[in-house]
Amino acid sequence: MVEEFKVTPWEVEGVVDYDKLIKHFGTSPLTEDLLEKTAELTKSELPIFFRRKFFFSHRDYDLILKDYEEGRGFFLYTGRGPSGPMHIGHIIPFFATKWLQEKFGVNLYIQITDDEKFLFKENLTFDDTKRWAYDNILDIIAVGFDPDKTFIFQNSEFTKIYEMAIPIAKKINFSMAKAVFGFTEQSKIGMIFFPAIQIAPTFFERKRCLIPAAIDQDPYWRLQRDFAESLGYYKTAALHSKFVPSLTSLSGKMSASKPETAIYLTDSPEDVEKKVWKFTLTGGRPTLKEQREKGGEPEKCVVFKWLEIFFEEDDKKLKERYYACKNGELTCGECKRYLISKIQEFLKEHQRRRKKAEKLVEKFKYTGKLAQEMWNEAIPEPLKRS
């Protein structure tokens, strides 16, 4: 990986240069033309995730739009590895996925990889990851997906995924997996097999698959694109998001393993206030006098970055806040108070919906229209013949 930063499916370190990452991964920039086409086809104003380039890169998104425009359609696939409670950084890509499902009217498959987290996390038992799976599913349902067009499945329960993974695994030799994921002689054999399971949902339909996810997950889809057509399927398409920074730094990404750096979806208003006041990195000057004279540096400020990514919907207000900071008209305390109120407002509504989600788990996993189809469907013929 490029020397200044590191991005893999398991860790992100340093301040990421996203332009360099596009070149390194061989993806394409998400251009204004593609965003305008998205707005045209959906007849909608773009959400802030697209307007502000939080999603910045893609593979074959142009072909997704072409398929939709010409009536072939597509489907969505994303997922969650249940290793602990979900935080703000985990949930934001799900809101982007919800917008895509809503506006394009397509099916969505959400894979809960309780098996992966057991294999990759030494400190977790399989019972732990299954328990976290249920907890995380409540947060995902609270986003507001269509229960008849969304199938949420746990790998440990939906064993059909294993039958699909076997022919996929036959297409991937160890050299390929090692080159993409950096496996070594110390890697558990379950870890080496797991990419086949994560790739399997890209073959759930004979349409092109679109995966909205953070760019650290791209290696899985690069591997799928190497052999998908030999199985009679499309190469999967992807939309890549940037990382949500932790409260304490603009480098790396928010981590559940460092509680002080993250806002969890179950945090209380008091938790939010305490964390933002105590831990959040700002772009302020050492003294109020300097702040007034020289102005702040919003480009170095986590508070501003969080408002930009998710918590300030109004573009005009965000721009005004940027220049008020640059001109020394705003103090860091004022911005922190504003962010605290925005986070508290979001979490209050999310937690209300999360409580209601308890009654919807069965529908998303087993009894909804798409869920029933998936439990009753046979393994696709091209995979059977492989």
From Swiss-Prot:
It catalyses: tRNA(Trp) + L-tryptophan + ATP = L-tryptophyl-tRNA(Trp) + AMP + diphosphate + H(+). Gene3D superfamilies: HUPs (3.40.50.620), Tyrosyl-Transfer RNA Synthetase (1.10.240.10). The keyword ATP-binding applies. GO terms for biological process: tryptophanyl-tRNA aminoacylation. It is found in: Cytoplasm. This is Tryptophan--tRNA ligase. GO terms for molecular function: ATP binding; tryptophan-tRNA ligase activity. It comes from the Archaea. Its EC number is 6.1.1.2. Keywords: Aminoacyl-tRNA synthetase, ATP-binding, Cytoplasm, Ligase, Nucleotide-binding, Protein biosynthesis. It holds the Pfam family tRNA-synt_1b. GO terms for cellular component: cytoplasm. It comes from Pyrococcus horikoshii (strain ATCC 700860 / DSM 12428 / JCM 9974 / NBRC 100139 / OT-3). Its main location: cytoplasm. The keyword Cytoplasm applies. A motif ('KMSKS' region) lies at residues 253-257. Belongs to the class-I aminoacyl-tRNA synthetase family. A motif ('HIGH' region) lies at residues 82-90. Disulfide bonds: none annotated. It is an enzyme of class 6 (ligase). CDD domains: TrpRS_core (cd00806).
